[in-house]
């Protein structure tokens, strides 16, 4: 815990961008735990997922929740965002896509927003990143299978969804 307290605020925020993801990967109300217990819970969740899928062929892909958009933002460059901040934006974006697809309801989107707000994380795609540019970046994502692929929340929890209609993303 003391090491975390030595980090500059923005670097700490980048780390909690990754922690926020684990709320939706089985971590529940992590924000109610002290920070050291949150980190330990995240490490345990990640270890359990990796042990169950050592070669990243299935369930392990859930660890990429929020990362499809995050990687697109990072690839586009020229934005003053760090990885954890981009992941937070990606989590909110993925929640909206899941809502549009009928996978989650407005209350679940609000839960995503609540978690991200708790950590004071950004949630909006940089304005200068156009829909056309995003679609191009999504189609080049290394995890893309049969068109646009996202890791999305849904009735069975977070899972990989392939072949998403680009119209849903605009």
What are these regions, as identified by a protein language model?
Residues 1-63:
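Carboxylate- and glycine-rich phosphate/diphosphate-binding segment that chelates Mg2+/Mn2+
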Residues 17-20, 103-170:
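C-terminal charged capping/lid subdomain of soluble metabolic enzymes
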Residues 45-49, 72, 97:
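Alpha-helical transmembrane segments of multipass membrane proteins
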């Amino acid at each position: 815990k003391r090491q975390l307290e030595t980090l500059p605020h923005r670097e700490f925020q980048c780390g909690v961008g990754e922690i926020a993801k684990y709320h939706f990967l089985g971590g529940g109300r992590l924000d109610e735990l002290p920070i050291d217990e949150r980190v330990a819970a995240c490490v345990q969740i990640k270890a359990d997922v990796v042990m169950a899928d050592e070669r990243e062929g299935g369930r392990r892909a859930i660890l990429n929740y929020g990362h499809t958009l995050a990687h697109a933002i990072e690839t586009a460059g020229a934005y003053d965002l760090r990885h954890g901040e981009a992941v937070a934006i990606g989590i909110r974006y993925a929640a909206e896509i899941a809502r549009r697809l009928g996978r989650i309801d407005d209350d679940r989107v609000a839960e995503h927003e609540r978690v991200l707000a708790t950590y004071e994380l950004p949630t909006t795609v940089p304005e200068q990143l156009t829909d056309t540019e995003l679609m191009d970046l999504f189609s080049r994502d290394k995890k893309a299978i049969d068109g646009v692929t996202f890791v999305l929340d849904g009735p069975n929890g977070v899972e990989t969804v392939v072949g998403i209609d680009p119209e849903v993303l605009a």
